[in-house]
Amino acid sequence: RVDGFFIEFNGVSAAPATLEKVHKALKEFKKSGKWIAAYGHEGINQADYYLASVADSIYLNPVGSVDLHGLGGMTPYMKKLLDKVGVEMQIVRVGTFKSAVEPYMLDDMSEANRLQTEHYLGIIWNEMRDCIAKDRKLQSAALNTLCDSVVVTFKADRLLKEKLVDKLVYRNQMEDILRARTKVDKDEDLNFVS
């Protein structure tokens, strides 16, 4: 018997397609009428939050934070290093948007590669942002502005104010909430599956 779904986040690391599948699976589970609760003890990363947004309630440790800032990427460029050690790459490249060899032949990202990278990351971020906004009943544009304003991470009190989390609780308080939802006595252990 499953009463609900409790997700405790600790740094989900998965490809965007995998995250999307899990997000959709959580939405399907939610259609059963059973509850979903999400909890972040320390820092919640962007992937964690994307999945947590499906939950009926998002709980966060009062000293926790969320890293929610959009998507980006970084490519190491090695041309100067290769020149310094005397390695000459033999590169065959056809086409403007063929950028796999750029790290060996350039010192910085080409404009064509920047354009295509911004385009595909933009598509992924827009989907994540729109899902989070819909799940949390926020405006996509407002969420985007909020994410653009973050320098490091959002602290717990700001997240509560912006309605990105529902309640700030410590782990033992989270267990009390789960006991109440599952009708488990205080002296009994909760049954978790991981």
Regions of interest found by a model, annotated:
Residues Y59-L60, V165-R171:
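Short acidic-hydrophobic, aromatic-tinged amphipathic segments that line or gate anion-handling sites
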Residues S149, A156-L159, L168:
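PDZ peptide-recognition modules
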